[in-house]
Amino acid sequence: MNDIKNIRNIGIIAHVDAGKTTTTERILFFSGFSHKIGEVHTGNTITDWMKQEQERGITITSASVTFFWKTNFYNSSINLIDTPGHVDFTIEVERSLRVLDGAVILICASSGIQPQTETVWNQSEKFNIPKILFVNKLDRIGAKYLSIIENIKKKFFCNILIINLNIGIENSFSGIIDLINMKELIWNNSQLEIRNITNKNFDISNKYRNILLETLSEYDDIFLEKYINSNFSIKDIIESIRKLVILNKIIPIACGSSLKNKGIEFLLDSIVNFLPSPIDIGIKNVSNINYSVNIKSKFLALLFKVFNDPYLGLLSFIRIYSGKIEPGQIIFNNSKNIKEKIFRIIRMFANSKKDLNIASAGDIVVLIGLKNSFTGDTLSFDNEKVLLEKINIPLPVISVSVEPIVKNDYEKLLNLINKFCKEDPSLLFKINENTGELILSGMGELHLEIIIDRINNEFNIKTKTSKPQVSYKESIKKTIIQEGKYIKQTGGRGQYGHVVLKIEPILIEKDDFIFKIEVVGGVIPKEYFLSIEKGILEQIKCGVVLGYPVTKIKITLINGSFHPVDSSEYAFKNAASIALKEALKKANSFLLEPIMKVEIISPKEYLGIVISDISKKRGNIISVVDNNNNLKIINSLIPLRELFGYSTDLRSNTKGRANYNMEFHNYSETPNYILEKIKKK
């Protein structure tokens, strides 16, 4: 076991193609974890181990690796998670960041801030994660460093601390200036030479070193006193940066080129020296004194991911916040009020594994043996009603129907899709009650394409699918009070359930669904509350406009009655479903469609035709800005319904010279004329 203060739980996050996996491969090589550098373009990287990742050259699932790095001040064990950059796999970033203590955000030196950069930045801010920025690809044509830093300050309103400078740019990028140690780091054929600052770089080095020291003095009174008296050391600088990073008062930024092996050692030093240990962060939102980041405290962990291994079964990825566990122990799932047994504890090295005899506070490990625990569940030894903050699951926006070519494979397909949905909470499925079709819903075309590819090739169930369809939602505009009764009398024991529900739209809260119980005086016994909730949850899966799931709705049980003999869970479940269905009919239900945030990068001469096409697609322009390379960046909001085949349209309109990225923005009311078109289909 490692000293907890030396553990670093970090993630690498960025827009797709910013170089996350390439950076991870270099980190693993320079740390001694691997003896050969994997390359994305040859499909032999350690963290992109899935066949689909290697074929496409992208990260699909977050991969965990553990390695070691020593600086002059720390000898650290680093649990590193390489996350996807593609918007379709946002859930992988979300659940990884939930359990990490620090992050490295990569930014491409030539592309700058991109849409998914904003998304992962906001995700890291949501969890108050201390971070380091690494401007990658300084060797690229069009690369910039200082101007990107200014853009970051303007975009995110943050205090950036420049800790190194580039020596040369684009093809002439040869090294960096370490502003902490005031040394030049030069790479010749991947060989590192450390030398004193040359006369050529002396003035700019002094300028930015002074800015660094003055920034630390502004936020750290202890360092200020040493700075005024000119009585500070390198250790004092590092300790001050570390303290301010952990407090989220500053964000260090460095530059390099992962592909060219330049700046990786400096980045590793920065991760270990500046990013927090589990002790520095503690256990967020838990005040129970029985739990602390200590091996002697009670066991407490969050299950943040599950994965079905073809040989080992269900792998449960957990972050341990308090205490310790060993194989063979019985643990308690606080979220579901059930017990589970740990058969094995393993540490993951991407797709390879090592058995452990013990795991303790600060660790990220995998449990084998858990059967009914899934993403977001809190685990402990005792049911003390302690629940860690859950993981936010995004709503799917696109659907396809899936059916097996061989009819006998239907049950196998159904079971497999059910397993995939447990692995990936942003993936949902339902069975069309009229046609019996399996409808699979996900975050985008690529998301569903990967799943279908795994079904066909990895599990050898050949399928046919429909064209992608938009996943609409439904909501309400009016508040309604509605009763529902389910009464049956057939000679023997009857059925009696009676509820009164108040339904109202959620206008402000972030929740998509709220259920509250406000009955008093025992008008309905407590043992029927769960059945009533089940009836409600079943009914909101099918709205009254077009049968889509209902969202942004608050439902309160306010009254009802029961029969001492005839009442049953079944009767109350049906009564709740009946009440809700009738209420939805009266509450001005309406259809919601997903709106996508689209960034288009196009040569200036095609700006007019691109904007005209956006208008035809019911889009709204947010901004049009220059990117200093004779290109225009058009940011817009466009309904997903209008974006099928957009790649072809954009290529045609710009002779193949424009490209675009998109991510989910929100759900918005569908205009009536579009609703009528959907109904006709």
Swiss-Prot record:
Source organism superkingdom: Bacteria
GO biological process: ribosome disassembly
One Pfam family here: EF-G_D2
GO MF annotation, one: GTP binding
InterPro entries: EF-G-like_DII, EFG_II, EFG_III, EFG_III/V, EFG_IV, EFG_V, EFG_V-like, G_TR_CS
Keywords associated with the record: Cytoplasm, Elongation factor, GTP-binding, Nucleotide-binding, Protein biosynthesis
Domain tr-type G: 5-279
GO cellular component: cytoplasm
Annotated binding of GTP, by residue: 14-21, 82-86, 136-139
Cellular compartment(s): Cytoplasm
NCBIfam families (alphabetical): EF-G, PRK12740.1-5, small_GTP
Function: Catalyzes the GTP-dependent ribosomal translocation step during translation elongation. During this step, the ribosome changes from the pre-translocational (PRE) to the post-translocational (POST) state as the newly formed A-site-bound peptidyl-tRNA and P-site-bound deacylated tRNA move to the P and E sites, respectively. Catalyzes the coordinated movement of the two tRNA molecules, the mRNA and conformational changes in the ribosome.
Assigned protein family: Belongs to the TRAFAC class translation factor GTPase superfamily. Classic translation factor GTPase family. EF-G/EF-2 subfamily.
Protein name according to UniProt: Elongation factor G
Name of the gene: fusA
